[in-house]
Amino acid sequence: MKIGVFVPIGNNGWLISTHAPQYMPTFELNKAIVQKAEHYHFDFALSMIKLRGFGGKTEFWDHNLESFTLMAGLAAVTSRIQIYATAATLTLPPAIVARMAATIDSISGGRFGVNLVTGWQKPEYEQMGIWPGDDYFSRRYDYLTEYVQVLRDLWGSGKSDFKGDFFTMDDCRVSPQPSVPMKVICAGQSDAGMAFSARYADFNFCFGKGVNTPTAFAPTAARMKQAAEQTGRDVGSYVLFMVIADETDDAARAKWEHYKAGADEEALSWLTEQSQKDTRSGTDTNVRQMADPTSAVNINMGTLVGSYASVARMLDEVASVPGAEGVLLTFDDFLSGIETFGERIQPLMQCRAHLPALTQEVA
């Protein structure tokens, strides 16, 4: 099973809590995180894109770096780990993304890929005057289909004459082209999102579900597997989890309860309000899960809380689910979390037993 880190491009990572570590996103922080991840044989690093935060006492995600420029910098200071940036496709023409991706492919030596997002949070785009109207909620995957077709043209042949409802290319050129086939990833959980991933993505991200229920996402992975079978492609699921670990189950649980007790209710209310604005995409979207009050303090990603041995066991359970090819991990404290994962959790995981011995620790 592949292991990736979801780097904290926004302030405070993924805990919407006054009791969680409070920090700003910086290049130096993310460089330290990704270099540690590479040292511990993580397979990939991904950054999201967020253009407006949730506010509240913690100013959650009000402070964000930009994904492509951050990952270009991280590509230059790593040598093995795969690097993914996220394109907010309403903000960037596909020909520009194609050229930026080819540039980072050159920087990284063929280790770069692109995560495509359609955009669901209206205020991110309304503030710039580029929200296309609420009809976009029901047409966003039509838009993304044209977008990726332009990308594939430009990466494949260096030229596109694509004509569609959203994009018109007229002898559009991009050169140099990527040195290896460019990987495209997506994070669709709606039927439309999974159908898109089945046709165009190399793999699809999905949310884990619940606290210490590592296989609860299995129906989502099964839906993705079924959608991919319809297209004759192999598109695996990569599952998002937060790891909160300590020496004992009780110590880890105490951390989790402490974070929940400090939930930033103002920021969470804003998230709930935004999640209700898309009335056209169905009830199975990522944002619906994010705003569920059950565990909104970490946007309801799957949460693994326990001793190092318990977390290792639960991750092995994740690996046993058909269609689950990897996990994307966040941590309550990224630097110490990756270190304890690499030193104390990963060595106990049967699904990572193939890894080579560690070299000297990264500075």
Curated annotation (Swiss-Prot):
FMN binds at residues 49-50, 115, 124, 140-141, 190. It is an enzyme of class 1 (oxidoreductase). Pfam families: Bac_luciferase. The keyword Protein biosynthesis does not apply. It comes from the Bacteria. GO terms for molecular function: alkanesulfonate monooxygenase activity; uracil oxygenase activity. It catalyses: uracil + FMNH2 + NADH + O2 = (Z)-3-ureidoacrylate + FMN + NAD(+) + H2O + H(+); thymine + FMNH2 + NADH + O2 = (Z)-2-methylureidoacrylate + FMN + NAD(+) + H2O + H(+). The keyword RNA-binding does not apply. GO terms for biological process: alkanesulfonate catabolic process; nitrogen utilization; uracil catabolic process. Coiled coil: none annotated. Induction: Up-regulated by the nitrogen regulatory protein C (NtrC also called GlnG) and repressed by RutR. Keywords: Flavoprotein, FMN, Monooxygenase, NADP, Oxidoreductase. Its EC number is 1.14.99.46. Belongs to the NtaA/SnaA/DszA monooxygenase family. RutA subfamily. The FMN-N(5)-oxide reacts spontaneously with NADH to produce FMN. Requires the flavin reductase RutF to regenerate FMN in vivo. This is Pyrimidine monooxygenase RutA. It comes from Escherichia coli O6:K15:H31 (strain 536 / UPEC).
